[in-house]
């Protein structure tokens, strides 16, 4: 029963974990794939490259706004860029390095991403994301774990032991951040999935509650409520 629910959770919210096409050894020599790779690099490189050098906050500008809400969000902007970027590129990185030009590019970004991840949890790093400073660390952890679950060999497998321990501690610290009765249940559930996969100790009831709640919130035609009420936003795909 437990493993069936985990499978359902991954199938719903991490489809690429279960269905990634086996394209190892494929070079980026056709037009569509070449454009796709170029787009990945264009989007991901500013985040991954700068974080790997401990210069993300220094080099990447953030939008300014006079609104109080936007000003508060400036604090978490850099952190949010990391989890989402890694969740996006992880399936590609998990293909691993090979002798093609694309495989060599992957090797470069695997090493860069692992260094970036290490910096993000190093208290001595300028780009350290303090796990107790904001509830948004729960959201970022969920997206980051989504990426790590999709690249367990190339990302988690290549992280140093100290960084792994720091991530586990950071994820456990988010348990004090109680989610609202909405899409945030998925974030807490994803953290527990990460702890199960990489830490061994997890809370099954958190995952079950998220699945049961979203099943009850189904509105039809592939759309889920963000809570009991209908609310169409990009979290439907998450």
Question: Where in this protein do the model-derived segments appear?
Answer:
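Positively charged n-region of N-terminal signal peptides that target proteins for export
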Residues: 1-5
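Bacterial N-terminal signal peptides
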Residues: 6-19
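Intrinsically disordered, low-complexity regions enriched in Ser/Pro/Gly/Gln/His and often acidic
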Residues: 6-8, 29, 85
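Solvent-exposed, well-ordered amphipathic alpha-helical segments
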Residues: 17-21, 165-168
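Low-complexity, Ser/Thr/Pro/Gly-enriched N-terminal "stalk/linker" regions
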Residues: 24-80, 87, 91, 111-116
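Aromatic-lined, polymer-binding surfaces characteristic
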Residues: 78, 89-92, 102, 106-238
